[in-house]
Amino acid sequence: MPRYGYTTGTCATAATRAAIIALATGRKLKSVEVKLPSKKNAIININDVEIKEDYAMASVVKDGGDDPDVTTGLVIYSKVSFTDSGIYVDGGEGIGRVTKEGLPVKPGNAAINPVPMRMIKNTAMETLSELNISSGLKIIISAPGGDKVALKTCNPKLGIIGGISILGTTGIVVPYSAASWRASIVLAMRVAIKSNYDTVILTTGSRTEEYARKLFNDRYPCIDVGDFIGFSIRRAAENGIKNIIIACMPGKASKLAMGMEDTSSRNSGVDFDFIYKMALSINIKNAEIIKNSNTVNALVDEFTDDGLFKLMAELAKINLRRISNINIDVIIFDMSGNVIS
């Protein structure tokens, strides 16, 4: 059974509750109970609590469970101090700042998404009420080292600079969740539209993104969609994107040429018999070589000049245009970044 984890939003909320209790009572709790957006409760372990004369700070170690979350292991801090009234929440060290339109958070604000922001504020108000305290609070969420971790996320592409985002719609991290990736794709498209782009490049990995950026000299925004090609095309059309350039490697291109929308190896491997029949359809010599190949990349040197990959790209375009009437082009790169289609 996979082990679930908790979002950065849940961690920040728990740290906030522990810090308020510490500031008000002097108690340093080892764990706190917080209410998740699902209305369920979760008990979160507290890493550390520090109490000073005019503030208290508590921390929670981010645990993403079995999900390969780059924020796992980060320490999320909440520093709280009393004010005259209201609940003010901002980001400190390691929390990103939004610089572009199209995200749930307005430019200039800390990258604390709406659901975790509500969690933090609601928990703060409930905790004050439990303690019979009528003053306000200033709450600063931080994550030392978040600036470096953020470079491994899509934050820089989304225009979130300087740190991680405080995220979570359910409060729980589902292991190996594809939902978070799909959500980031949609966000990136909205940012592109808000930035007045009507053309985006959908890449199937970090290498194709690097090659596409170099080829187009960063003229269009690149979005790493992984295997979610069909999903991304539909969302692009819904969000007003007019033109899509698919940048991929030969293996994934062959799957698109077959009519697949999800190119994950979990769903299907490369069909070399299909590629062989493609080669026969354009009278390629030595097509028998394809039957004994282990990878599509191994065919590049032998068949690029024979038009095999140009046909592959054309078939991929025909299939992908059936998903939406959006204008679609397909570019295939070899392992060295050369365009072979």
From Swiss-Prot:
EC number: 2.1.1.195
Pfam families with a match to the protein in the record: CbiD
Assigned keywords, A-Z: Cobalamin biosynthesis, Methyltransferase, S-adenosyl-L-methionine, Transferase
GO biological process: anaerobic cobalamin biosynthetic process; methylation
Transmembrane feature ranges: none
Molecular function terms from GO: cobalt-precorrin-5B C1-methyltransferase activity
Catalytic activity: Co-precorrin-5B + S-adenosyl-L-methionine = Co-precorrin-6A + S-adenosyl-L-homocysteine
InterPro entries with a match to the protein in the record: CbiD (IPR002748), CbiD_sf (IPR036074)
Taxonomy, superkingdom: Archaea
NCBIfam families: cbiD (TIGR00312)
Similarity comment: family membership: Belongs to the CbiD family.
The protein's name: Cobalt-precorrin-5B C(1)-methyltransferase
Organism: Picrophilus torridus (strain ATCC 700027 / DSM 9790 / JCM 10055 / NBRC 100828 / KAW 2/3)
Gene (UniProt): cbiD
